[in-house]
């Protein structure tokens, strides 16, 4: 049996409850439609503002979903780095992108060995917080092996369809920093 809901009234004085409720609706309603001619947008209409914290959370999660949904001819090391640069808050975060020459210099030889099987150059992204007055020791590391950045011939055929997700660790890291 299907139900149709035209309006929802929420009686709460707690903004957090409202934010969590709307957050659930917006996450459920995510549709990646970049390549659809007739994209379906959300049918929900709201007459309130989501807090900045939850709006930022939703935007970060949707960015993560977009990154892992894109096909491998769209997301590869260089395009991943460019898309990341366009999304981060440049006032709060420094982003340094290391190319193959720099990767060799700092000795990331395993990355270079895997990358020999690819026609695309490797990229390593390094983030740091700008103007931080606190000395906080937090490190996020996310593996971002994009499909066709090497190693395809050493993967068993049974795992090939999941190779696209090998970059999800880096996508999560970027989304946290975003």
Predicted regions and their residues:
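Alpha-helical metal-binding/catalytic segments enriched in His/Glu/Asp
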Residues: 84, 138-140, 153-178
